[in-house]
A protein has these predicted regions:
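Residues embedded in well-ordered secondary-structure elements
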Residues: 43, 61, 120, 197-199
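Small/polar-rich, solvent-exposed N-terminal microdomains that initiate assembly or binding
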Residues: 1-63, 92, 97-107, 136-192
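Short active-site-adjacent helix-start/loop capping segments
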Residues: 61-64, 80-82
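Short intrinsically disordered coil segments
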Residues: 69-72, 88, 143-149, 199-201
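An N-terminal amphipathic alpha-helical segment
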Residues: 190-200
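Short, conserved charged micro-motifs
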Residues: 80-85, 141, 212
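Oligomerization/assembly interface segments of phage tail-like spikes and tubes
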Residues: 65-78, 124-136, 200-212
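Long, acidic/polar, low-complexity amphipathic helices and coiled-coil-like
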Residues: 67-69, 82-84, 88-91, 95-124, ...
């Protein structure tokens, strides 16, 4: 599954959201990027609110050190007061979880902001949450590899944790239950040493992140 499919799976499997959202084709009303038309048979003539629409923008934000942004918009009619509960459920569902798309680096999301507004011409409220998408790309490079050495050492002393690059990761890891370590090369520079006519010396700084 790709990242969008993982997010859909995570949201649609949440029991709290299942009880609060409208249904479409027998499933919670959660959609990627756009809603089906109001006349679609999947609504089965029932209410179309509350519902959720999410989208992913994989544009790097260097200022926030993020690989992109996840937007989750929640819609309810103006007579409903459930939107706050839906917001809480979405946050709880997406926070403290590592997601591993097939063939890609693992990702986490971190809540950044929430904006509220009314839909013009409709009796509908919307709350849109923005999450920073944090990517944990593989950092291994040379042989012998200092990043791999640090990662292997951490796994040795904390075998109950997951160390990215050492352990195989499934679709989801709930980091509140299983802490995750991520090692990366933060800095690398030439330095001096003996036998410099035959040996190149480097000094490096390795950053260790604990995701929990």
């Amino acid at each position: 599954m790709n990242l969008s499919e993982l997010i859909f799976k995570r949201l649609s499997a949440d029991e709290n959201l299942q009880t609060m959202l409208a249904t479409y084709a027998g499933a919670p009303a959660i959609f990627d990027s756009e809603f089906p038309a109001d006349q679609q048979e999947g609504w089965e003539g029932a209410t179309q609110y509350p519902r959720i629409c999410y989208r992913i923008d994989m544009q790097v934000n260097q200022e926030r050190s993020s690989a992109g942004t996840l937007y989750v918009a929640m819609y309810t009619d103006k007579t409903s007061t459930i939107i706050e509960d839906i917001e809480t459920a979405v946050k709880h569902c997406l926070q403290d979880v590592l997601m591993k798309p097939a063939g890609e680096a693992p990702f986490c999301v971190a809540w950044a902001r929430t904006e509220s507004y009314a839909i013009e011409g409709k009796e509908v409220w919307c709350k849109e949450m923005a999450f920073d998408i944090l990517e944990y790309s593989e950092q291994f490079s040379t042989d012998p590899d200092p990043v791999l050495a640090v990662a292997a050492y951490i796994k040795k002393i904390f075998p109950e944790t997951i160390v990215l690059g050492i352990d195989n990761v499934g679709d989801f890891v709930e980091t509140s239950k299983t802490p995750v370590f991520y090692c990366r090369l933060a800095h690398l520079a030439h330095t001096t040493g003996h036998c410099m006519n035959t040996i190149s010396w480097f000094i490096g700084k390795i950053a260790v992140h604990l995701i929990y």
